[in-house]
Swiss-Prot record:
F(1)F(0) ATP synthase produces ATP from ADP in the presence of a proton or sodium gradient. F-type ATPases consist of two structural domains, F(1) containing the extramembraneous catalytic core and F(0) containing the membrane proton channel, linked together by a central stalk and a peripheral stalk. During catalysis, ATP synthesis in the catalytic domain of F(1) is coupled via a rotary mechanism of the central stalk subunits to proton translocation. This protein is part of the stalk that links CF(0) to CF(1). It either transmits conformational changes from CF(0) to CF(1) or is implicated in proton conduction. GO terms for molecular function: proton-transporting ATP synthase activity, rotational mechanism. It is found in: Cell inner membrane. It comes from Salmonella typhimurium (strain LT2 / SGSC1412 / ATCC 700720). Pfam families: OSCP. The keyword Membrane applies. This is ATP synthase subunit delta.
């Protein structure tokens, strides 16, 4: 986990509460995602680690973001710059997404397979995970040829490894012991 998670949580909570109150959760997530990407820019990273005055840093950051940030998003940037916390924006986004998922009773489920899965397979996985987790799921599919065949499903700290690679690794462990 990133060192900024504890720092990011109150900012994410404040942004999320504000977004819910103003029915703009999607817009806020988009603004935070854009601002988080800006912090990853090499030149911006140098500015963030430099000795600029917080007001100058905030205005420079806001200028780079342009119209991607509304007035309230700009205010968040100013507050975070004032407290030297702009580096925590990627973690603020991550915490915001977790808060949104919790409020919408959804879970992000990562499905890794060797080949693209059919719509039927994805709907079966989705239904099974919704039943198991007792909430709606959003599938994020990845293709990894090293899986060989089968799938690996990750939801939070739960991992279901139904891949050939996983079976071979478990077999190798048994044979070595």
């Amino acid at each position: 986990m990133s060192e900024f998670v504890t720092v990011a949580r109150p900012y994410a909570k404040a942004a999320f509460d504000f977004a819910v109150e103003h029915q703009s959760v999607e817009r806020w997530q988009d603004m935070l995602a854009f601002a988080a990407e800006v912090t990853k820019n090499e030149q911006m990273a140098e500015l963030l680690s430099g000795a600029l005055a917080p007001e100058t840093l905030a205005e420079s950051f806001i200028a780079v973001c342009g119209e991607q940030l509304d007035e309230n998003g700009q205010n968040l940037i100013r507050v975070m710059a004032e407290n030297n916390r702009l580096n925590a924006l990627p973690d603020v986004l991550e915490q915001f997404i977790h808060l949104r998922a919790a409020s919408e009773a959804t879970s992000e489920v990562e499905v890794t397979s060797a080949t693209a899965l059919s719509e039927e397979q994805l709907s079966k996985i989705s239904a099974a995970m919704e039943k198991r987790l007792s909430r709606k799921v959003k599938l994020n599919c990845k293709i990894d040829k090293s899986v060989m065949a089968g799938v690996i499903i990750r939801a939070g700290d739960m991992v279901i490894d139904g891949s050939v690679r996983g079976r071979l690794e478990r077999l190798a462990d048994v044979l070595q012991s």
